[in-house]
Amino acid sequence: MTVSFRHGVASGDPYQDSFVIWSRVSDVDGSSASVNWEVSSSPKFKKRTILDSGTISTSSDRDWTVKALPEGLQAGEDYYYRFEVDGVVSPVGHASTLPEQAPSVRMAVLSCANFTNTEFFETYRRVAEIDAQQPYDIILHLGDYIYEYGQGGYPSAESAVENRGFEPDSELLSLDDYRQRYAQYHSDAGLREMRASAPMVTIWDDHETANDSWFGGAENHQSDVEGDWGARRDAALQAYYEWMPIREPALRRD
């Protein structure tokens, strides 16, 4: 089976001279993959327009996700990026650096995205359509990017759209559970289009881990049957960092 980029591309956390770029490879034949990336001033990626490039290794340890931090870019400029493995090229994403000064900022602001509710989840596609006509400077997501419930938890099974149930169909507890839910979310074409259209700035709320979570637990966590809260929380946040185009401690600069 040929390697693919079925979960799309994304960018995020823009600075005046850099931003994070993200993708995920699927159907890898082996225990790891070397992923090439390029950032260009042109969507055609002619050699003279390539401004930064590199290679990143990924594996199942990162759920086959990759992030890069191109630097040395100019403030307030548009850029294009893509990834490549074994001759297979990802979709092209668009990102922009922050301007040195801006009299105004154009943002799309989103939160609380329940995959099973297609009526509201369609908002992602609409954001991408609007961006194509009137580009956003950033896409700001204020959390509840995913929901941790199992089938029938939220919304009720009766209101879930046929063939649009949660994967896995049980409540998320393990790292594999959370990873599977993120993969399901990014099977949505509208979400992929939006993430490729403009840089994202994101924070988590509670449902990225569990409903009404706090340091020592959550309303939707029962330690006697669901295990250690700290292990669940850490698994949830690991998956979040893997799938979101944001800076991690290893990507931060002093």
Region locations from a protein language model:
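Metal-dependent phosphoester/phosphodiester hydrolase catalytic core
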Residues: M1-D254
